Amino acid sequence: MTDKEKRLERQSRIRNFSIIAHIDHGKSTLADRILEKTAAITQREMKEQLLDSMDLERERGITIKLNSVQLKYKAKDGEEYIMHLIDTPGHVDFTYEVSRSLAACEGAILVVDAAQGIEAQTLANVYLALDNNLEILPIINKIDLPSAEPERVRGEIEDVIGLDASEAVLTSAKAGIGIEDILEQIVEKVPAPAGDPEAPLQALIFDSLYDAYRGVIAYIRIVEGTVKPGQKIKMMATGKEFEVLEVGVFTPKAMPTDELTVGDVGYLTAAIKNVGDTRVGDTITSAVNPAQEALPGYRKLNPMVYCGLYPIDTAKYNDLREALEKLELNDSSLQYEAETSQALGFGFRCGFLGMLHMEIIQERIEREFKIDLITTAPSVIYDVYMTDGEKIVVDNPSNLPDPQKIERIEEPYVKATMMVPNDYVGSVMELCQGKRGHFIDMQYLDANRVSIVYEIPLAEIVYEFFDQLKSNTKGYASFDYELIGYRPSTLVKMDIMLNGEKIDALSFIVHRDYAYERGKIIVDKLKELIPRQHFEVPIQAAIGQKIVARSTIKAMRKNVLAKCYGGDISRKRKLLEKQKEGKKRMKQVGSVEVPQEAFMAVLKMDDSTPKK
């Protein structure tokens, strides 16, 4: 057999697939079982959620990053198949990670919980898979639960998604039932990768990782051609050239190999020092014999939510910059730029995909880089049209121009799809109305579950929406959203003033109708959170020059009359007047420290949904 024939023969036995599911429907457990079944890992190494390698993922029990692993499986037809399993996150903020892993596969296993049925995210991920023309294999998991209703769920898959579920494997990943059937279905139904191992190299970078010793490690999927150590490669987006040092696959550990060819999913190192040189979604090609065009990459994802991150210890500003650079390498959807605030000093304005993403980045910086952070209230991106015809983009409330110069402000709207049990439809609709939502559609999926669609401003979803939705439905609702564009709204900027000074980090943009109530809530919250000073501190919420709410932190005062035994009123009055003078002087020079909780209070306005 020639080299080419060997490669083609091997290629016909490659199967690339990923697992998609709603949060908690059991995809990481299923991945564990598949690893066990194909003996990729020994019993000793087995731990729950093996592919979730970040501590944070294991603690929260969610998958954040995608992971890939190569497995060998001896099928019933006697052939040994090479499978690449790419584990994906299920949470709405990480849809991007999902779309990246799907671009590297030919098939997807769709895991549906036998008790809960189809959830909002299941649908979102299925549509992503269909966009990538993947072969989808439905699987009904958790059939060992007492509340499992596999037949109902089978019907649901057919009705709601329109997939043929007659051959859907009934499994229990926890008990290890039905795992072999899944592997056989993958062999039978998922197509082998197409491509020519002799063609010019085209490899898709679907993730990258920074290693202090080896520089950047790119995770790649070979679409055409072959790559070996010593070969000169070129990045198509940046035009930079490198020499390959090592290629290999993950079994979950990194294992160097002689070459990677069509259909392989593995990694490549090439002494790439600069993070910006390996863009996720870029195509790697050979420098000597380059491909004509790049692979259709991923869409560059735009952040939905922005917030300021400031180090509590200002000396750590450079450490924070390095931390963000390293995180950005693994997380192509994180964006940041330097900014300064009068209240908080130097920091960064960062863009995130959503609230969970924001929390996780914060937590990773605090854990992995040991930097304590202050975060400002998250805000979305507004399009501001000026009276002179100019359009500016505002992601930070303190940059909003003077109201006299603004013609209109447009804010992003999302289409939110919620799947809720029947009994909670009323409270969910009330929640959405309170969040300025427009009702679009409602469909009964079966006797117990309803899909509700609303159009809601993104700014309203950013604050606590998911938590409130969960608490209104006892945790049963699932939720997914997509951006549908910008619409004009009557929005105003609210400033918070302490002792007559604006605190820029506490400013936020709010709908005019809700401004008074939001202002009142924040002022009252700050009154509880800011410690009492030796002088009186007024807290005011203002729109432009107009004060809409005020609260006062009373001064702490010593009892100056304690020493005064005599009852002489003039003596007492003199002491009190003297104290008053002193307080007045302190007030002029005194500055007020704002604790971190106060910044968070602006975010957590849970009771702030005005009842209309």
Curated annotation (Swiss-Prot):
Enzyme class, UniProt record, top EC level: hydrolase
GO cellular component, one term: plasma membrane
GO molecular function term, any single one: GTP binding
Pfam families reported for this sequence: EFG_C, GTP_EFTU, GTP_EFTU_D2, LepA_C
UniProt keyword annotations, A-Z: Cell membrane, GTP-binding, Hydrolase, Membrane, Nucleotide-binding, Protein biosynthesis
Keyword GTP-binding attached: yes
Protein name per UniProt: Elongation factor 4
Organism of derivation: Bacillus pumilus (strain SAFR-032)
